[in-house]
Structures are given as C-alpha cells and as structure tokens.
A protein has these predicted regions:
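Conserved beta-strand position repeated across blades of beta-propeller domains
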Residues: 94-95, 143, 186, 232, ...
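Short loop/turn segments that connect beta-strands within beta-propeller blades
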Residues: 119-123, 167-171, 210-214, 258-261, ...
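A flexible loop/linker signature enriched in serine peptidases of the S9 family
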Residues: 86-88, 105-116, 132-137, 153-164, ...
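Outer-membrane beta-barrel initiation region
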Residues: 69, 106, 295, 345, ...
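Beta/coil-rich, acidic/histidine-enriched accessory regions frequently appended to metallopeptidases
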Residues: 2, 26-150, 156, 168
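Transmembrane beta-strand segments of outer-membrane beta-barrel domains in Gram-negative
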Residues: 471-534
Length: 534
C-alpha cells in the first residue's frame, strides 16, 4: 500500500513540477523511447530517476510541513490513548456498556483478523472470534444488540457475505443468512430488526431483516450509481441515517424517518451535502439529537457534529493525522480512532464545537491549478457510447469458434542433455473459456537420433459452463519428445522420448475460502517411450 501511495504522489509531483505531458510521454512506448523505464525517464525529464526521487522527497517534506503549520494555526485537539499501540485496520465500533469495552473487528500484522473487545479504561484486548474472509480496511460489517448481547457480523466480505450472530458472553455462534450479500449492518432496538445494504448486479438496495433473522425484505432499490453506506439507527428506532454517493461522485448525509421509509417514502427529513468529500461513519448520539462522524472536508479527516433537527454542521476536532469512526458516549465525549503509521489507535476526546479549522493544500488541486489542461482530461460517460452501433454480430457464442492468436514468442528448451530452439503460439477466445497452445522446437544436437530432434507439444483447454455433471475444465494434450526449459539447468530431467496423449478434467466441488475442494483426474497413453530411470 505504501509503495502504491508513494508512487501516486511521485507521479503527481512530476506532473506538477514538469507537466502532465511529460508524464504521458514517459508512460508511452513510441518511436525514440527506451525499453528501460529508468533510461526513458532520463530522456523525458533530463535527469536520472534517483535524483528526481530525492528531489520529490525534499519537496514532500516542505509541502507537508506547510500543511501541518496550517493545521496548527488553531489549537489541535488533544486526546487520551486507550491502548499502548495501534490496532491496524478497524471496523465500525460499539460500546458494550455492561463490560465497558469497545466491540469491533480488528486486523493487524501478525494476528488473524477477529472480532475483539477493548477495555475503555485501558487494559488487555480480548479476541472473541476469528473473522472468515475479512476486508482489508473496513475489516467487517458489524452491529450490536445490547439487550440480547449479540454481535452481528459478516464473513466472506469480498464475496457473497454470510451474516453471523455471536453471543458476546458464551461465544456461541450461529449462521443467520448464507450468501446474503448484505453489509453496512445497523440494529434497530425498537423492533430488534437488522438493516443493511445489499449489492447485486451493480445495484444497491436497502433491506430489512426482521427477528428472528431468517429472511430479508427489500425496502428500496436505488438507481444505478447511487450507493448508500454507513447506516445507523437512532436508539428510539425513529430515524435512519445513511451516507449516499451518486454516480457523479457527490456525497451527502441523509436522515430518514423509518416510518416513512417503510411506506416507500424516501424523502429525507434532513440532508447535508458534502460535495466530493465522503461523510464517513456517522452515528447517532445516545439521545438522538446529534450525528457524529468524520470527513476530509478540510483536507484532514476531522470529526463533525450535525444537529438532526436543524442540520447545523460543526467541526469538533482539529487533527493533524486524522480522526475516524467516532463513538458518542454523550453529546460532549467521544471515543474515536486516530491514524498512525501502524494503523488506527483508539482514543478518548472532548467534542467541543470549533469556530475555525484550517484547510490544507492538496497536491492534486495545486497541479490542476498550475496546469489547466488537466481540467479537460476527463473520462467520458458510458452514456455517450452507442452500444448498439458496436455490435458486429448476433449469434450464440462458442468459445472454440472464437479462438484467436493471443501471443507468439521464441523458446529455448532442454531435451535430455541437448538444447532445442523453437516457437510457442498461444490462442484463446475473447472471454478466456478456451485456450490452445502449440509449441514446436528442434534440437541443435546433431548427435541425437533423427526421430528425437523434433519437439512438439500441444495443449487445449475447454471450459464447459452449464449445470450438467460435465461442467468444468477439460484438457486435451499431446507431446512428441516432450522438452522442458528447466532441463537446461538441473540434474532432474522431465524430457522424454516418445508420444504422450492426455485427457484431463478438473471441477471445483467446494469454494468457501479458506476451504476448497476439487475433483481432478488425468488419463494418459504413452507410446514409443524410453524406459524411465530407476
């Protein structure tokens, strides 16, 4: 991740310091360019890459130093750390008032992702349950029922998502819904229902899961490109809050009366527009009067308080590295997470409304301001493309009938103790159901018998997509004097004189990571073979 972030900043700095056209010229491979990215960098930018990298580091220190000075124009928010070290990635968090612990999903190096509990007053964290299939940054979608002391959370978070109920005290676990594809969980204390967002075929839907959680009911499907996230429900069960992003990249925080939502009225009672910045993790205060959450509204992730009745919007933190996922204890005290180089650290702070918070400079915005041509570099809308005009044929698709040349390249192989040279040709269809590779080579060793000098290897894979028992990947291959690249080096030889015909089949029987099961078999026929060495 750090390498990705550093690379992104470096490329942006190149565009800022030189021009966007320089960056494009370096990325292109046209006449006059060099195969080596380092050599081509020097051609385009007029200096070695390592020198430019050091210049960027010096620039970055100065740039970020100025940003920190801007933040410090006004007093920064003080806080009390709840743990001696950071906890990596963290999910939404709840307070278990009975045990005075924070309940959340955690994922950090050296420890398997898990549902855990952290004492609010300090102390050793407790691991409650490992998470199957955690997400990298959000970790897990989680909700909490304090009355039954049940933790609801999701597994397989990058796949179809199961919803699990975990008893906080006994550790007993139950799968409620399998492959439900529902996340962003929120619990309604008034009727003990679970709410969430279900994703399918590119569309997001608001769903309600009534007790005892055996089925979900559709509440509202949203237009394509409109995605609600970070649901929360007030303690009295009257209001639902959600952040909403639209297809233009604009975001808002909305508050809805649950009674109206259930009557198919999704007109918000309150809406606060955040523009291009995301409203994240907004949750109701215990009395339902406020919503607390975070946003990069000032360029740094600060905490904000929104009056549910009036929509008044106030900053309650001035952070240097950012605060995230606030948990209101009351209207003045928050538990939250501050960002460190090792991940998120839980902290306690006072939510005092601030009159002034400084913005910081964005390198991207500075680059656009300096090079106005970037304002015209925008991706077009898919709606601008006439899909019908691009259809070249209408027919049933057959993978074998759509095989085309994918690549071709020379090969060097080892055959016994000699060297063979030749070519390999790879073919595949447009959606990679079928593939064919043909490799032909000839030994340069004139001492080999004539019938052993040619090397031929043909491999064809055909994927059957259907509900029949024959669905799976079929493999048909033939080798004549099979040769292998690694026979050029090691004492173990895989090359063999003669013919080999193979029919193989592979079928996935179970795919439920980390568990998987496959059926695999191969039938081989050999002829004119040398005896294998003992």
């Amino acid at each position: 991740t750090n390498a990705y972030l550093y690379g992104t900043r470096f490329i942006t700095w190149l565009a800022y310091n030189w021009s966007p056209e320089h960056v494009v010229d370096w990325a292109k491979r046209d006449d006059g360019s060099h195969r080596s990215y380092r050599k081509d960098f020097e051609r385009v930018f007029g200096q070695p890459l390592d020198d430019a990298w050091q210049e960027w580091i010096a620039f970055e220190r100065e740039f970020q130093g100025a940003n920190l000075e801007s933040v410090r124009t006004y007093p920064t928010t003080t806080y009390q750390a709840l743990t001696p070290e950071a906890l990596g990635s963290v999910s939404r968090t709840y307070i278990d008032e009975e045990t005075r612990t924070l309940i959340a999903g955690f994922q950090y190096p050296g420890v398997i992702a898990h549902i855990g509990a952290i004492p609010v007053d300090g102390g050793k964290a407790e691991q409650l349950r490992e998470i199957k299939g955690p997400a990298l940054y959000q970790v897990v979608s989680i909700a909490w029922d304090p009355e039954s002391r049940t933790i609801f959370y999701t597994t397989d978070n990058y796949e179809y998502r199961d919803i699990i109920a975990l008893d906080r005290d006994t550790g007993k676990e139950e799968v409620l819904l399998k492959d439900a594809r529902i996340g962003d969980l929120a619990f309604n204390r008034a009727d003990k229902s679970l709410w969430g967002i279900r994703h399918l075929n590119g569309y997001a839907s608001l769903v309600r899961i009534p007790h005892p959680y055996t089925e979900w009911n559709l509440v509202k499907s949203f237009p394509y490109g409109t995605v609600p996230y970070d649901l929360d429900i007030s303690r009295d069960g009257q209001f639902l809050s959600t952040s909403v992003g639209d297809i233009r990249g604009k975001h808002s925080l909305q508050v809805h009366a649950i009674e109206d939502v259930l009557l198919d009225d999704f007109e918000p009672e309150q809406e606060v527009n955040f523009g291009d910045t995301l409203p994240e993790g907004f949750t109701f205060s215990p009395d339902g009067k406020y919503l607390f959450g975070s946003s990069f509204y000032t360029g740094v992730s600060n905490l904000f308080r929104i009056d549910v009745e009036t929509g008044e919007f106030e900053a309650v933190s001035n952070a240097e590295t950012g605060f995230f996922r606030p948990v209101p204890i009351d209207n003045e005290t928050l538990l939250a997470y501050t960002f460190t180089g090792q991940g998120f650290m839980p902290v306690k702070l006072t939510a005092t409304p601030l009159e002034d918070v400084s913005n910081i400079r964005s390198l991207g915005a500075q680059t656009i301001a300096k090079h106005r041509v970037l304002e015209t570099w925008k991706a077009g809308s898919p709606d601008d493309i006439d899909a019908e005009s691009r259809i070249v044929a209408r027919d049933n698709y057959t993978a074998g009938g759509n095989l085309g040349l994918e690549s071709m390249y020379p090969v060097v192989l080892g055959y016994k103790d000699s060297v063979s040279v030749g070519w390999k040709f790879n073919f595949s269809d447009h959606i990679m159901l079928d593939s064919l590779s043909i490799m032909g080579a000839h030994s340069v060793d004139s001492d080999l018998p004539t019938d052993e000098r040619p090397n031929i290897m043909i491999d064809y894979k055909h994927t059957v997509v259907s509900a029949s028992p024959l669905a799976g990947t079929w493999n048909f291959s033939y080798a004549r004097n099979g040769a292998d690249f690694y026979d050029l080096f090691g004492p173990t030889k895989r090359s063999r004189k003669g013919n080999r015909f193979t029919v193989g089949f592979e079928k996935t029987m179970l795919s439920d990571g980390p568990k998987s099961s496959s059926l695999l078999f191969n039938v081989n026929y050999f002829s004119d073979m040398d005896a294998l060495p003992r």
